[in-house]
């Protein structure tokens, strides 16, 4: 045993012992890491799946180790690091670490530009992730800058009028609708119809998202999500160079164009699925594709009925509601439309209370207003009664004013649209009331005052 100790402590063998120990530790580390890391090609799809399944916390440390192995093997600027950087960003985002997620996305973006070029279309997916993260952080200006940059990159790669740009046009239009830029959205959806007109001849159903977007832009113009005096000033801004919004100013208040877009969608669906137009059809006579067509046609017709109701054409809306109710009933348990209770179509956002300077030191408290009401056959709110209010009277007027402007799709039965009582609307909000002093806090405040005076 002594001889063994003497042997190990000799200078010649000390370095060998250290090298041997390092080799054993490295071998054990590779054993702990997934077998996929030890292979030349690393499959990261499993990590992507686990992140989608909300299992990011269980795999993020392992993913960091995988990143380190790839970086050691391939170098700090290897394109092999792009995907793990994206996955690390996705994982951190799932865990709510949005700033850290952006750092990973920034690195992935830098690696993509370094390896594939400054304006490479491969970077668009990363930029979209950055935009979505900024939206979660409620940084709307930064999110818009990212969305518009991704659009410009793809437009440069494919051509501004290429049908390959249609997915980017659709996404940009959806973003503008989310951020209340109805003119920008309208211009993009029209551009999409022009760019895809050749492709839409063979598959007109592919034009439906753009037609629906045009209708939604008019609906958003007429029914803004909040009370504003001149909302057109907020709706005509875009950083996209080839998007001219000047001509769209002439489309303001041209609401029949939105109705025509919805009517065109119905015509496309009827042409696509002629079997569902037959008044004698039943669910049993339709195959899976035709059944899906019937559901989509019903939804398109319902969108037009809701449009009529929103724009005050109640008689037209009721006629269509009765027709859709009958068509949906033909599908029996396969019908996907529920008319058993009113559905909210529009309600303005209730303005929150302002935290003024004198309230700056107060902690927010939870308030609530609860109102019961009736929805009549025209979709309007009647007979409101406040059943709960705390603090009493603080937000009652704002809530009731909002409900007076609300529009519901009424309950529909065999006889058509009907009145519905017993509906409830509940609004919770933050307010800043004075905090009641406890004896302990009062005593502490007195001590602080004495120390200051001394």
Language model: regions and residue ranges:
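Bacterial N-terminal signal peptides
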Residues: 21-31
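Non-membrane alpha-helical segments in proteins
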Residues: 45-52, 80-94, 108, 124-135
């Amino acid at each position: 045993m002594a001889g063994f100790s003497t042997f190990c402590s000799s200078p010649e063998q000390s370095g060998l012992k250290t090298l041997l120990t390092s080799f054993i530790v490295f071998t054990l580390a590779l054993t702990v890491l997934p077998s996929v890391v030890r292979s030349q090609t690393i499959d990261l799809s499993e990590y992507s799946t686990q992140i989608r399944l909300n299992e990011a916390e269980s795999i993020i440390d392992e993913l960091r180790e995988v990143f380190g192995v790839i970086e050691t093997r391939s170098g700090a600027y290897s394109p092999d690091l792009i995907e793990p950087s994206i996955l690390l960003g996705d994982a951190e985002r799932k865990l709510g670490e949005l700033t850290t997620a952006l750092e990973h996305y920034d690195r992935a973006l830098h690696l993509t530009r370094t390896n594939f070029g400054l304006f490479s279309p491969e970077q668009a997916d990363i930029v979209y992730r950055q935009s979505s993260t900024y939206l979660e952080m409620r940084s709307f200006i930064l999110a818009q800058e990212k969305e518009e940059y991704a659009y410009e990159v793809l437009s440069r790669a494919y051509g501004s009028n290429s049908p390959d740009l249609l997915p980017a046009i659709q996404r940009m239009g959806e973003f503008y609708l989310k951020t209340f830029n109805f003119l920008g959205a309208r211009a993009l959806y029209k551009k999409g119809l022009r760019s895809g007109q050749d492709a839409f001849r063979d598959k007109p159903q592919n034009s439906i998202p753009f037609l629906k977007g045009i209708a939604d832009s008019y609906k958003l113009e007429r029914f803004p999500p909040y009370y504003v005096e001149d909302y057109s000033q907020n709706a005509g801004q875009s950083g996209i160079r080839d998007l001219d919004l000047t001509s769209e100013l002439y489309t303001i208040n041209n609401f029949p164009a939105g109705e025509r877009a919805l009517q065109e969608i119905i015509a496309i669906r009827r042409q696509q699925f002629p079997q569902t137009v037959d008044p004698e059809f039943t669910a049993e006579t339709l195959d899976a594709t035709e059944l899906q067509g019937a559901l989509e046609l019903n939804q398109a017709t319902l969108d037009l009925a809701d449009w009529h109701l929103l724009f005050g054409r109640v008689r037209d809306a009721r006629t269509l509601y009765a027709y859709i109710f009958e068509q949906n009933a033909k599908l029996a348990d396969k019908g996907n439309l529920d008319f058993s209770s009113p559905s909210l179509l529009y309600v303005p956002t209730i303005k929150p209370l302002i935290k003024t300077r004198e309230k700056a030191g107060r902690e927010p408290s939870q308030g609530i207003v609860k109102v019961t009401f009736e929805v009549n056959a025209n979709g309007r709110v009647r007979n409101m009664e406040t059943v709960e209010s705390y603090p009493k009277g603080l937000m009652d007027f704002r809530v009731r004013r909002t409900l007076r402007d609300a529009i519901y799709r009424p309950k529909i039965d065999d006889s058509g649209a009907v009145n519905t009582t017993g509906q409830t609307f509940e609004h919770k909000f933050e307010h800043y009331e004075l905090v009641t002093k406890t004896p302990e806090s009062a005593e502490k405040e007195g001590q602080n005052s004495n120390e200051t005076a001394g």
